[in-house]
């Protein structure tokens, strides 16, 4: 292989292997670009140990983070947008509301609330929290809110806490997701598209919710 350029992501991580790629590429005279995969890659994962030739950040906030926290020369940092979400912007729902609700086991006549679960690092005991939240929804004084359908979508990297959890005593609820994909996930898109509102603690899927204009 004789590449023209090497692109690395997430690079600013806990492990060193992508730093080795950067060192090797630069030794061979190949330009190296770094594309942050997620919004928090420059603030809570690790350091950029060797500055790439270009850092293609999402926005001015990430540009400041790259320069301030990682010491990347400002002239190497380019605001290029969030490449990860390009495909998501172009997506369309794969199912009608009736078909989606039939798959998820929900009443299509009711509005849907989507709960997006977080990683174990953020929410180590999310099951008990979600149960309390669902109880608050069902006992709400608002007659439109209380009977809403509820989808609990486990975090794709941390589904284990929801294995075997039974929400059967709470009507019109489901723990549901299609086979998860890292990006351009059609199951996530459909869940967001057909929901009236989205709830979560701290997960990148809130960005996808914002793309679809969901409160």
Regions found by a protein language model. Name each.
Residues 32-33, 150, 214-215:
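Hydrophobic anchor at the start of a short beta-strand
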Residues 85-178:
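Conserved catalytic-core segment of nucleotide-activated headgroup transferases in glycan assembly
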Residues 19-22, 45, 130, 134-138, ...:
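Short amphipathic alpha-helical segments and helix-helix/interface helices
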């Amino acid at each position: 292989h004789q590449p023209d350029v090497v692109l690395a992501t997430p690079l600013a991580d806990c492990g060193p292997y992508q730093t080795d790629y950067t060192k090797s590429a630069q030794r061979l005279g190949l330009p190296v670009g770094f594309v942050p995969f997620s919004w928090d890659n420059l603030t809570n994962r690790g350091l950029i140990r060797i500055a790439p030739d270009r850092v293609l950040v999402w926005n001015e906030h990430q540009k400041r983070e790259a320069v301030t926290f990682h010491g990347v020369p400002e002239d190497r940092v380019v605001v290029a947008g969030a490449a990860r979400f390009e495909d998501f912007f172009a997506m369309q729902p794969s199912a009608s509301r009736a078909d989606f609700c039939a798959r998820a086991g929900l009443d299509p006549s009711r509005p849907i609330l989507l709960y997006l679960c977080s990683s174990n690092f953020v929410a180590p005991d999310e099951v008990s929290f979600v149960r309390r939240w669902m109880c608050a929804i069902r006992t709400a004084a608002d007659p439109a809110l209380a009977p809403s359908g509820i989808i609990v979508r486990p975090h794709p990297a941390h589904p284990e806490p929801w294995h075997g959890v039974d929400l059967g005593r709470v009507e019109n609820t489901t723990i549901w997701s299609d086979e998860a994909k890292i990006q351009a996930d059609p199951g996530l898109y459909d869940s967001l598209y057909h929901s009236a509102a989205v709830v979560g603690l701290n997960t990148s899927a809130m960005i996808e919710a914002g793309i679809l204009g969901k409160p």
